[in-house]
Amino acid sequence: PMVIRTARQVSSLDKVVIATDSQEVIDLASQYGFDAVLTSSSHNSGTDRINEAVNILNLNEDEIIINVQGDEPFIEIEVVQAVINRVKQIKENNEDIMITSCYKEISSELADDPNHVKVILDEHSNAIYFSRAKVPYHRDHHEVSTYSGHLGIYGFTKKSLNDFCKLNSSKLENIEKLEQLRAIDNGHKIAMVKVISKSFGIDTQEDLNNALRIFKK
C-alpha cells in the first residue's frame, strides 16, 4: 500500500505516526507495525488532520513535527532531514518562521502542469507566493529553463502547527487550493530549503502508472 511505502521511506529518521480518518488505514498500519491515529473526517487539509493527531498524542510544545503526505512514496530521507535541520536552526535562532518546507528545480515543461506547484522566494529563501500557475512570468524572455517546484513536506514545532491551524482559511488558499497560502495571507513566513530530489507525488493517473512501473522494477 502507498501509505505504508511512504512510511517506510522515512521510518529510519524518527518515530512515524500515520494520521488518517480511515479505519482501513488504521488496520493496515497495525498490520505493518506502524502507529496510527484516527482523526475526524471533516478536516479541510492534511495539516489540520496532523494538528488533531499531534494534540491526541499530547506532544510537547517544542516537539518538531514533519508532515509527509501519504502520496509521496519515493520521498528521500535526505529531503526530510534537510527540513528537520532547518526547523532545528529556526528553533535555536528563535527565528520568526511559522512553517518550513522545501523545493527543487523543475523544467519549464513540468512547470506548465498545475499539479506541480511553483514557489517564488525572497532574498532570504522565504516563500513570497505559491501557485499552480507558471510563475514567475519573464516578460523579456520567451522561455526560462528551470522553475522552483514545491515539494509537499512541511516542518513545524507543535506550537507553530497549532498557531497555523488557528488561522482562518484565506481567499488565496481557497482559490489555488494550497493550504500553505493561509500562512502567507496572514503575514507569517515560510522558510524554504532547496533540495535535490527525484521524488514525485501521486496526483494523477499518469503519476500512479509511473509509480507502478517503478514498483515493478
Regions inferred by a protein language model and the residue ranges of each:
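N-terminal glycine-rich phosphate-binding loop and ensuing alpha1 helix
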Residues: P1-A19
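Short, high-confidence coil segments that cap the C-terminus of an alpha-helix
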Residues: L13, E61-D62, E92-I97, H188
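Hydrophobic/aromatic residues located in beta-strands of well-ordered beta-sheets
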Residues: V16-I18, I65, I99-T100, A127, ...
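Short phosphate-binding loop-to-helix
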Residues: V17, Q23-N85
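A conserved hydrophobic position in a structured secondary element of the catalytic/binding core
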Residues: T20-D21, I75, F156, D203
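Conserved core of the sugar-phosphate nucleotidyltransferase
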Residues: I75-S170
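Conserved alpha/beta core of the MobA/IspD/sugar-nucleotide pyrophosphorylase nucleotidyltransferase superfamily
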Residues: S145-K217
